[in-house]
From Swiss-Prot:
Main subcellular localisation: cytoplasm
Listed name of the protein: Eukaryotic translation initiation factor 2 subunit 1
Modified residues annotated as Phosphoserine in this record: S59
Region (Disordered) location: 291-326
Length: 326
């Protein structure tokens, strides 16, 4: 076998066998630029083919600022309105996409992306192009099993059945299985909840420290609660765990403990800011930037402020800007 191909030699390829999306398909796009006619986007599942969301298809409601609806660099779920295979024109709509559509598309895209990342790695390792491996293995699996990831999951247990009659070497099969197993390993979720805690009474700083300390003490073997200072009276409760519901439950429990404790002091009070969120991508980066100058608060920490810093993340921004291929 020759040297593995470089990334530029892989001949990157669309996720699916069909060359264009079809009318009424839900697809994931990345916004590249916004002009008078609309937003120009890259269609991620179709090798960054260009499409356009017309201004009239951005929202059902009137809007003054386009940036409140769509931003350059963001990922968006859109509906395919028209496809001109000859000219390569693809018209898209954001306003016709329902919240259920977004969830459905994000789940499908996440599965397809795992498959595509595996294909890229295996193709590079075995001196193949992405399209070659897609044609030999992945696209037939989509056709037969509905989604290639479901088939590859089954292949980790029954490889002879799934890969039967496929024209690939045992080495390629092993690489596909080992790579997909790694991608199927559950990843820890990071959750955060923002709170304000203050005490204008005599105990002041000590009261706040004691309340936050009590909140951290609810940590157990499954969930560790960390509390970070943003700028008094703003704090963020952060935890990582595999079980989203358990993580949210523990953050809520910590909030209650902190609230109950601080209210024992004269002048002490507590307020939750927004909902508990799963964070990742840009949200996590913004949070890290905020906390860069602060360590976790303990009973010995200084109660100090560098000004009213805020993480400016919008709780109603639901699009997840996933990183491109690993």
């Amino acid at each position: 076998m020759g040297d593995a191909r470089s990334k530029t030699d892989l001949g990157d390829c669309r996720f699916y066998e069909k060359k264009f999306p079809e009318v009424d398909d839900l697809i994931m796009v990345k916004v590249n630029r916004i002009e008078d006619m609309g937003a120009y986007v890259s269609i991620l599942e179709y090798n960054d083919m260009e499409g356009m969301i017309l201004m009239s298809e951005l929202s059902k409601r009137r809007f003054r600022s386009v940036n409140k609806l769509i931003r350059v660099g963001r990922h968006e779920v859109v509906l395919v309105l028209r496809v001109d295979n000859q000219k390569g024109y693809i018209d898209l709509s954001k306003r016709r996409v329902s919240p259920k559509d977004i969830i459905k598309c994000e789940e499908h895209f996440s599965k397809s992306k795992k498959v595509h990342q595996t294909v890229r790695h295996v193709a590079q390792k075995h001196n193949m192009t992405v399209e070659e491996l897609n044609r030999k293995v992945i696209w037939p699996l989509y056709k037969k099993y509905g989604h290639a990831l479901d088939a590859l999951k089954e292949a980790t247990m029954n490889p002879d059945i799934i890969f039967k009659e496929m024209d690939i070497s045992d080495a390629v099969k092993e690489s596909l299985l080992s790579d997909i197993k790694l991608r199927l390993t559950p990843q820890a979720l990071k959750l955060r909840g923002r709170i304000d805690v203050w005490c204008f009474g005599y105990e002041g700083i000590d009261a706040v420290k004691e309340a936050l300390k009590k909140g951290k003490e609810i940590s157990n073997n499954e969930v560790t609660i960390n509390i970070k200072l943003i700028a008094p009276p703003q704090y963020v409760i952060v935890t990582s765990c595999h079980d989203k519901e358990l993580g949210m439950q523990k953050i809520q429990e910590a909030m209650k403990v902190i609230s109950d404790k601080i209210k024992e002091y004269k002048g002490g009070d507590f307020k939750q800011q927004g909902e508990i969120l799963v964070i990742g991508g840009d949200d996590e980066k913004r949070l890290e930037e905020l906390l860069d100058k602060h360590d976790g608060l303990s009973s010995d920490d200084e109660y100090s402020s560098d000004g009213d810093e805020d993480d400016s993340s919008n709780d109603d921004d639901n699009s997840s800007d996933e990183d491109d291929d690993d």
